[in-house]
């Protein structure tokens, strides 16, 4: 009897000890470091992305000016670190007010998502980062990331996407030689920039706006027109004007050359002698056409924007076309109209050449 009692007592004590140990172990077990933070960060990213998605679409729906810049196709990031670059050119007339990156991608499901990320830079400054999402079903992940507008500048802007992708969490370079650490950026990815038109967009230094613009990159919505009684000089100047705009086109030239009566467009570049120019166009001029040289003026009539080149003498028309084809001279025209003299282009070229020779001929005592 005593032996059975002792045995029962021993088993009870062992069971109690086991329960106490289990409870203590449960109390001391900690949530793995970073799990809560990762969850909270994921929720924050989802909320921010949803807000940026609204910003991405709302402006377009409201009829605001915007431009989309894309990679033009699927891009693949592979290796531990890779950088993908996208250039966005903002002309002088476009004042950026907001920008959103829509990023669509798929990623290898072998990626360690807790330590793999995408970081975003604009003109060398980081503005955001997000963990890479790898879906086993191959579905795309779509993110919307707001770009601080103060990072944008007139001219070329460089957007960079830096990927950091790991398959193993140990030190070493094995990931560099593994083809499974990839992220594919979809062709639906784009940088959307909303902008306003500058208050001085009607000044000549903004040329070739609005005849070529972010909204009209190939010139399809613009025409170069000559008078219905056009002679060879007018046609020559008009073709020079079209050729000069070629460098400003971001797509194949779709601009047309036509007679004024056939100009069915809201953007008209007109080249004509005064004697062949209809009165309704002459009435838009705020300055008189000179006896020598040409008058170049921006004007509007209702919904139509004009660039009018009018002259008394034939040679002046080609002179005006040469002026507008020279970006360095156009950049100095902070006015809506200007006069051009015959021979001005040659004088400018000689002055530039002489200036270059003078600079080239400058020596210091040290050089000698």
Stretches found by the model and what they are:
Residues 1-2, 45:
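Generic cytosolic/nucleocytoplasmic N-terminal low-complexity/intrinsically disordered segments
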Residues 11-12, 26-27:
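Short, low-complexity disordered leader/linker segments with a strong preference
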Residues 27-368:
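Solvent-exposed alpha-helical segments and adjacent loops
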């Amino acid at each position: 009897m005593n032996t059975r009692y002792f045995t029962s007592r021993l088993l009870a004590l062992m069971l109690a000890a086991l329960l106490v140990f289990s409870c203590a172990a449960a109390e001391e077990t900690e949530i793995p470091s970073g799990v809560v933070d990762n969850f909270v960060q994921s929720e924050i990213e989802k909320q921010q992305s949803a807000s940026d998605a609204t910003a991405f679409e709302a402006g377009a729906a409201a009829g605001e000016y915007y431009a989309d810049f894309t990679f033009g196709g699927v891009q693949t990031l592979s290796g531990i670190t890779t950088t993908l670059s996208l250039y966005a050119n903002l002309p002088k007339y476009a004042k950026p007010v907001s920008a959103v990156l829509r990023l669509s991608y798929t990623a290898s499901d072998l990626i360690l998502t807790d330590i793999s990320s995408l970081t975003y830079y604009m003109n060398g400054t980081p503005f955001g980062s997000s963990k890479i999402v790898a879906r086993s079903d191959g579905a795309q992940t779509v993110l919307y990331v707001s770009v601080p507008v103060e990072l944008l500048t007139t001219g070329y802007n460089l957007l960079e996407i830096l990927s950091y992708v790991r398959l193993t969490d140990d030190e070493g370079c094995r990931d560099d030689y593994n083809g499974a650490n990839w992220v594919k950026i979809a062709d639906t990815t784009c940088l959307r920039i909303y902008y306003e038109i500058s208050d001085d967009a009607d000044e000549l230094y903004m040329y070739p706006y609005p005849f070529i613009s972010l909204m009209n990159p190939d010139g399809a919505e613009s025409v170069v027109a000559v008078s219905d009684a056009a002679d060879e000089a007018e046609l020559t100047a008009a073709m020079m004007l079209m050729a000069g705009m070629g460098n400003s086109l971001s797509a194949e030239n779709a601009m047309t050359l036509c007679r004024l009566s056939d100009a069915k467009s809201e953007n008209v570049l007109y080249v004509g002698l005064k004697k062949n120019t209809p009165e309704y166009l002459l009435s838009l001029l705020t300055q008189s056409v000179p006896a020598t040289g040409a008058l170049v003026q921006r004007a509007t009539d209702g919904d139509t924007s004009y660039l009018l080149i009018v002259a008394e003498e034939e040679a002046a028309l080609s002179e005006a076309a040469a002026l507008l084809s020279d970006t360095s001279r156009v950049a100095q025209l902070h006015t809506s109209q200007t006069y051009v003299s015959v021979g001005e282009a040659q004088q400018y070229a000689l002055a530039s050449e002489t200036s270059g020779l003078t600079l080239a001929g400058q020596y210091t005592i040290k050089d000698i």
